Amino acid sequence: MEENKQKALSAAVSQIERQFGKGSVMRMGDSTVSRDIEAISTGSLGLDIALGIGGLPKGRIVEIYGPESSGKTTLTLQVIAECQKMGGTAAFIDAEHALDPSYAQKLGVKVDELLVSQPDTGEQALEITDMLVRSAAVDVVIIDSVAALTPKAEIEGEMGDSHVGLQARLMSQALRKLTANIKRSNTLVIFINQIRMKIGVMFGSPETTTGGNALKFYASVRLDIRRIGSIKKGEEILGSETRVKVVKNKVAPPFKMTEFDILYNEGISRESEIINLGVQLNLIEKSGAWYSYKQEKIGQGKENVRLYLKENPQVAAELEQQIRTELLEKKLSVLASSSEDLFETIDD
């Protein structure tokens, strides 16, 4: 860069820093700029790998949507449990007034430490979210759900009154205000959303999410969660088979897909995922109905192997670490080295 241009740029940067504070503008190559994104595990090994960074990114907005009874709240409660395991603080904005503390406890949530709010209006819910985010003392805030964020005017109005676009305007205004505070405080904010059908759609999917388009733009990660089957033992249904698609991802390559089992009163079955991924990577050998690990038979049938891993957590932890190393850490090291090359090119 020419000397005069360099001087002009330095003067502009110093003026910006005087006016708006140090760090208002910086070079991406500076050592002070963090290139690593912190993540909180989802409680699902496969989903952590599909997200590319080992979980959901902190300092970002995430949207989880799907049909009813697809596992949206279960997944977010697992995120809270993982956050609390790391010593973090979580808040649950229960706009639907449907949080079941006993179910949350079964999934590993420390209910006594969980901050819960049951707001009356959408404005109140989003204002509480903003205050929690600005405190920079909360690691995860869950809003359940966007569809239940009813504007004050609608609550105070008559039943048949028309309030066109009121909720979409509320969401758009709130997200404009929230997004900078979320980044500054490094808080993970998760919005749970429901699916609606667009009328008169001839081509393409008629499905859409509630609350307008603002959340689609502001979300760094969007997850589409679907129930694809039931887990049965004879006639008894033990849980549901679930598929999650990463529809949008600003922090890693998107469009990855994963499947896992959600067991009633237990949550996401980590052991089932370890078995599936272990077999894929040849860490667990499968011969007919028998499964072996390190030349030792560990069970006949998937359910028996799942129980074996549950009773032997050290074996499960060892396998999980091998899977993470194989599928996640190698990928992250490749991404890190390629981004370093990019920054070096920019500096040159």
Swiss-Prot record:
| Cellular compartments annotated | Cytoplasm
> Principal place where this protein is found?
cytoplasm
Q: Name one GO cellular component term.
A: cytosol
Q: Name one GO molecular function term.
A: ATP-dependent DNA damage sensor activity
NCBIfam families membership? tigrfam_recA
Q: Which CDD domains match?
A: RecA
Specify the species. Answer: Legionella pneumophila
Residues that bind ATP, according to the entry?
G66, P67, E68, S69, S70, G71, K72, T73
Name this polypeptide is given: Protein RecA
Q: Which UniProt keywords apply?
A: ATP-binding, Cytoplasm, DNA damage, DNA recombination, DNA repair, DNA-binding, Nucleotide-binding, SOS response
- Give GO BP annotations, semicolon-separated: DNA recombination; DNA repair; SOS response
User: What are the leading ranks of the lineage?
Assistant: Bacteria, Pseudomonadati, Pseudomonadota, Gammaproteobacteria, Legionellales
Q: Note the InterPro entries from the entry.
A: AAA+_ATPase, DNA_recomb/repair_RecA, DNA_recomb/repair_RecA_CS, P-loop_NTPase, RecA-like_C, RecA-like_N, RecA_ATP-bd, RecA_C_sf
Q: Which domain of life does the protein's organism represent?
A: Bacteria
Annotated function = Can catalyze the hydrolysis of ATP in the presence of single-stranded DNA, the ATP-dependent uptake of single-stranded DNA by duplex DNA, and the ATP-dependent hybridization of homologous single-stranded DNAs. It interacts with LexA causing its activation and leading to its autocatalytic cleavage.
Say which family it is in: Belongs to the RecA family.
Q: What Gene3D superfamilies does UniProt report for this protein, alphabetically? A: P-loop containing nucleotide triphosphate hydrolases
Tell me the Pfam families matching this sequence: RecA, RecA_C
Keyword Transit peptide among UniProt keywords:
no
